[in-house]
Amino acid sequence: MTKIIFMGTPDFSVPILKELHKEYGVDLVISQPARPVGRKKVMTDPPVAVAAKLLGIELYQPETMKSEEALKIVADIEPDLIITAAFGQLLPENILNVPSKGSLNVHASLLPKHRGGAPIHRALINGDKETGVTIMYMAKKLDAGDIIAAKSIQIEDNDNTGTLFDKLSRVGASLLMTTLPYIIEGTNKRTPQTESEATFSPNILKTDEVISFNRPARDVFNHIRGLAPWPVGHTMQDGKRLKIFAAELTNKTADAAPGTITGKSDNGFLVAATDGLVNITEVQLAGKKKNNALDFINNNSDLIGTKLGEDG
């Protein structure tokens, strides 16, 4: 029987954990500790920890994997495999070297493209037409290990980070189940990554959340959906932060300065970019509830002709 330790944190990892546990059994789940969430700062377990408890799997939630305690807990399992999926911590070499059949990662990009912590967000923001999942051996260098298998999917115009997370999570679970028998037998392929083709997708910073309209409409649209539904991009409206949850491309040309609200649409309001208009469909003004953009502009029709700013 194959002994497996699974490491993961967000919703992306949960279908992978469930499928892995159903088919092989997971001996230990390692996830991030509970964190304060929301205005009331309620201590909340990450989705993988919640799933592990529901599945009745032993759970360990360390602040760091670089401690002697973490090494002992992993080594005591005597695992054949460590499998990670969006765990959120770098594993030291002494952990990576414990399992007899290797340490694997389910990464949400077509490596070596989009190494790093935000491959799904960055694929959308960059305007990529396709993305995918890679099963790889972990190495000391982040996301640089040998590739075992990969599967690509198309990025559609109606995708955002949330929909791509869901799609790639399912792809990752399926690809892992297809690949694991060969890994366990030791008959899988492993292909070194081409370093010259590597690109990097670091975690989203606060500065990345500012939506600028001073660029082509397609770039604005990609930026908005790449941050939706989290962490959500924003602009400024008369000194107040305006979050933009959703938008659409139009075939309308711009005849106003970038950032200008030019009028209403059937389901929102239109904002000028450098080469066309972006249709904003869901917003939230600071201190207010999230609202569909048509209701927002109907209640604030005096904003038509004003300009959304980039400060804040």
Task: Walk through the language-model features, giving the residues of each.
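N-terminal Rossmann-like dinucleotide-binding module
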Residues: 1-40
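Short amphipathic alpha-helix with an adjacent loop that forms part of the alpha/beta core around
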Residues: 68-78
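Donor/substrate-binding cores of folate-linked one-carbon enzymes
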Residues: 22, 81-200, 207
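Glycine-rich, highly charged phosphate/nucleotide-binding loops
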Residues: 60-70
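Proline-aspartate-enriched helix->loop->beta-strand connector
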Residues: 26, 78-80
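N-terminal beta-loop-helix "entrance" segment that forms/cooperates
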Residues: 35-55
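An anion-binding loop in the catalytic cleft
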Residues: 214-312
